[in-house]
């Protein structure tokens, strides 16, 4: 039986997790909570999406929530996660996608309402992080609060794993060329902690920080301290790309790297890591469900130990599909 899921926070990721849950069919969303959205407005936001198009199905409202494809889904407007009656709705696995409750202590408030597990759809300072295809098999059923890491870590980690497993990584630097997100500004505005981040998203390339590369060391312990990186926020609305430059332990040709990535993409990382030799651009991957799509033509080797690798990701859709996959996976472990 599909695990019953509740979603807290019906913003970009919350809504796209919802769409992916329906598309994948492996989890059953039974309830949603968002204190800032009324039910009829939630229906509108779910139906129409500027990036991913109209919802393919039917959406109606009733006095207690939404009716999606004929199925009732309770909608709550609680500000405090502890007050959301997940237990009454039968929701066991909660997607914490507000971006606010990202620590174990804050996210565990959901357990008070009857939930069994909480998956944070963001990096966490203290909750264990899992990346599907990389370290999900280290999950133990006594873990109650966990993180699906970030979209960028989900792109970088599978690629880094393949390179490290086959050729060894001495050290590496990553740049993610990242589409703008909701935290950025439409026009110049105040941003006290990040002055550059307060500048207009649609007309600037904005250097920014990211913890995504360092986080790889948490999901692949042998790479701890060997990777770091930064971001360039660019004027595109979705789909980002990781540029990973690594020094390898073993001498390697670029063709050998391509072969290793292609093999992994067709076997143990199928559906998570992709491989393409097509001349693609970012919009070609809008709506792609994979975490990381290796661009064989875009990378380059300086010598046999120093290589630049390029991998794309739909930072909304692909990441949200992994949230669904992680819940599907841990529910099977929990049932054993």
Curated annotation (Swiss-Prot):
Keyword Ligase: no
Binding, NAD(+): 12-13, 34, 79, 315
GO biological process: cellular response to osmotic stress; gluconeogenesis; glycolytic process
Amino-acid positions noted as binding D-glyceraldehyde 3-phosphate in the UniProt annotation, renumbered to this chain: 150-152, 181, 210-211, 233
Gene Ontology molecular function: any one: NADP binding
Keywords for the protein's UniProt record, in alphabetical order: Cytoplasm, Glycolysis, NAD, Oxidoreductase, Stress response
Induction conditions: Up-regulated when grown with elevated levels of potassium chloride.
Principal location: cytoplasm
Active-site residues, record numbering mapped to chain: 151 (nucleophile)
Subcellular location field: Cytoplasm
Catalytic reaction list: D-glyceraldehyde 3-phosphate + phosphate + NAD(+) = (2R)-3-phospho-glyceroyl phosphate + NADH + H(+)
Domain of life according to the entry: Eukaryota
Function (record text): Involved in osmoadaptation.
Family, per entry: Belongs to the glyceraldehyde-3-phosphate dehydrogenase family.
Protein name: Glyceraldehyde-3-phosphate dehydrogenase
Gene that this sequence comes from: gpdA
């Amino acid at each position: 039986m599909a695990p019953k899921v509740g979603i807290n926070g019906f913003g970009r990721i919350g809504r796209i997790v919802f769409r992916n849950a329906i598309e994948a069919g492996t989890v059953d969303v039974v309830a949603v909570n968002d204190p800032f959205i009324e039910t009829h407005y939630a229906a509108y936001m779910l139906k129409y999406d500027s990036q991913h198009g109209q919802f393919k199905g039917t959406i109606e409202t009733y006095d207690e929530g939404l009716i999606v494809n004929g199925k009732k889904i309770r909608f709550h407007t609680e500000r405090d996660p502890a007050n959301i009656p997940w237990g009454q709705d039968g929701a066991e696995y909660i997607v914490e996608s507000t971006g606010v409750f990202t620590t174990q202590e804050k996210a565990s408030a959901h357990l008070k309402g009857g939930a069994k597990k909480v998956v944070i759809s963001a990096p966490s300072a203290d909750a264990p992080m899992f990346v599907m295809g990389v370290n999900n098999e280290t999950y133990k059923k006594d873990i109650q609060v966990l993180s699906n890491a970030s979209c960028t870590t989900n792109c970088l980690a599978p690629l880094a794993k393949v390179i490290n497993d086959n050729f060894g990584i001495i050290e590496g630097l990553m740049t993610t060329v990242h589409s703008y997100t909701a935290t950025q500004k439409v026009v110049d505005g105040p941003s006290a902690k990040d002055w550059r981040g307060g500048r207009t998203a649609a007309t600037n390339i904005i250097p920014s920080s990211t913890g995504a590369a360092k986080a790889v060391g948490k999901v692949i312990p042998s790479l701890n301290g060997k990777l770091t990186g930064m971001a360039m926020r660019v004027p595109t609305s979705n789909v980002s790309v990781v540029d990973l430059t690594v020094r390898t332990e073993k001498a390697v040709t670029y063709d050998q790297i391509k072969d290793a990535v292609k093999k992994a993409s067709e076997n143990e990382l199928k559906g998570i890591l992709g491989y393409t030799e097509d001349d693609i651009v970012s919009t070609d991957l809008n709506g792609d469900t994979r975490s990381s799509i290796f661009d064989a033509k875009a990378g380059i080797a300086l010598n046999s130990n120093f290589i630049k690798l390029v991998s794309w990701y739909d930072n909304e859709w692909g990441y949200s599909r992994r949230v669904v996959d992680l819940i599907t996976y841990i529910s099977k472990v929990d049932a054993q």
